[in-house]
UniProtKB/Swiss-Prot annotation:
Residues 428-452, 729-749 are annotated as: Disordered. Ca(2+) 2 binds at D40, D43, D93, A94, N95. Residues 1-124 form the C2 domain. This is Cytosolic phospholipase A2. Ca(2+) 1 binds at D40, T41, D43, N65. Disulfide bonds: none annotated. Stimulated by agonists such as ATP, EGF, thrombin and bradykinin as well as by cytosolic Ca(2+). Gene3D superfamilies: C2 domain (2.60.40.150), Cytosolic phospholipase A2 catalytic domain (3.40.1090.10). Its EC number is 3.1.1.4, 3.1.1.5.
Amino acid sequence: MASIDPYQHIIVEHQYSHRFTVTVIKATNVTKGTFGDMLDTPDPYVELYISSAPDSRKRTKHFNNNINPVWNETFEFILDPNQDNVLEITLMDANYVMDESLGTTTFPILSVKPGEKKQVPFTFNKVTEMILEFSLEVCSSTDLRFSMALCDQEKLFRQKRKNKVINGLRKLLGPEKTQDLNSTSRDVPVIAVLGSGGGFRAMIGFSGVMKALYESGVLDCATYVAGLSGSTWYMSTLYSHPDFPTKGPKEINKELMHNVSYNPLLLLTPQKVKRYVEALWKKKSSGQPVTFTDIFAMLIGETLIKDRMNRKLSHMQEKINDGQCPLPLFTCLHVKPDVSELMFADWVEFSPYEIGMAKYGTFMPPGLFGSKFFMGTVIKKYEENPLHFFMGVWGSAFSILINRVLGVSNNSKGSTMEEEIENLKPKHILGNDSSDSDDEMQEPKGTENAKAEEEYLRNNQASWVQRMLMAILGDSAIFNTREGRAGKVHNFMLGLNLNTSYPYSPLSGLCTQQSMEEDELDAAVADPDEFEQIYEPLDVKSKKIHIVDSGLTFNLPYPLILRPQRGVDLIISFDFSARPSDSSPPFKELLLAEKWARMNKLPFPKIDPHVFDREGLKECYIFKPKNTSVEKDCPTVIHFVLANLQFRNFKAPGVPRETTEEKESADFDIFDDPETPFSTFNFQYPNVAFKQLHDLMEFNTLNNINVIKQAMVESIEYRRQHPSRCSVSLNDVESRKLHHKDSQSKFQM
């Protein structure tokens, strides 16, 4: 891999931290005073405190009845050298009821020079002497990677995957249309498959899509598969399966159908809840935040991957290291308290190789996500989070499922996505983001309309489950506040300096796609305040950050795929978002993605919503650059929507339905059915409903394979015409600043 990273340190200002090491060696003549010593021999220990350090307080073990203790214990603090760092040393006496301070002194850390090691004596109460040893070193490297470039592992994956893609294209398109493709050719297009959110509806629909793409050979031509919320649940199920890709989606989807056919109440048996609580307690006692999302994560994991709850995101590397499968990309949002996610949200991307935020160019290995950081250095490392924790975070909007099971109010059956998630939006998050306090405001609970025979079971199970969880966790706010339902992790950007930054794209001002006029960018798609604060930076002083379902801003994971470094030519997106009715226009989420792309100076084809008026509802729509010589970096988008059209009359492309049974099985609506079998918050799918949704999306995909193949051919031709497509040199990159939307130069970041 190249040793020079042209994007290094262009987002986070280059800075160093100091590692301050303290060894508490010993103390002599520890005393509680003449009268105190007559009553009791001291049980001494030492407490170290640096207010400016993130992990600020350390302590030694205590010795019983020992006036000359020898500790020889070493502690480390990561410090910002630009702050006035002072060490506070307190000699303590351990007691059964309340520990007693025997004296406090301070030490200015500035008196220790980098590279120096020295012993310093301290005197307490005129007779007690304590010896400490100090050393200071500069941390020249960090645990975070500061860059907008792809990591070396992804670059290596792309090289290996290219050979697989070439073979896939040759097999799918034929030798005539792929005769000049080779592993060194820039003609090989980068193809991405996208799946939207939408709960189990999205997961099941995407399972049918992936089966069609796998069996048709299209998946062999893709470099990336990106998902959001419900689609990530299917991707997690697929990529964590021990037999994938040897065993394809057909067999794995049968297992999925079986798993989602059960009532979620069965997950709340005493034995299972005891296991959940033990895991939550272990996490909380280790110093990690625990919220409602952690509980939901366990339930979604038990439903979908119950036989592999110990699997990690990094384990997926074995599925992609040789380029055998497309690289899976997952996402969630970082949001701020009391700010709508439509106004401000940072997209967080997850891959088996890295987790981070491209907006700031900060990334880390999956095993470090959730650890305590300061100035880019890990100060407390935890075990890598299990995959099911991420599944809960990626689909955290659906933590409302727990409220339903536990009888908490939510009368959202049959409502649109916007109505269903209104109470979960980050603009309602309560509390101080930087606080470590668990004190949270209370919300009143209500009741949910349900069948009478289910109400008794729900109420009784809910009461004891709540009592057990709250008794052990001691935190009723987990159930009763919106903040408790948002995921929360330690802020990995704590203490960093964001003075220098870039737009999401380093190609700003260089990309030649047609730009939207300013009034077009100001035009609202879903909300007058949408994206109002997307140029605002993350709060690097907050100790923790909130992370939520990306579908709360817009329901398609385009930000992952639009990173210029990935250079994607063809995007095949599948939108399972809720609509008011089956006949409603299907472009709202796509229009939001387009607006977000324009505001971040990223190439995106013009989305014309009037195509719906001209052509009506279709299974898929194509949006491409109008002039490839001008918009040479712009990808082509094939946008599939959730619609039951030709499937009603054909059981396979070109194969008509003949029997009454065949016709009746396909005669169903998605959003207009009064029974709402495909509701966003339906978490139990009978086999019949599963097969209907799965087979519908499999059919719609296969029915448009020729559309996909033609777009692939055109993408190869675009590459041949523009060999410099999506490339950028260091000389092209200009310095920019983060700014408010209403600043004078609105998009000159």
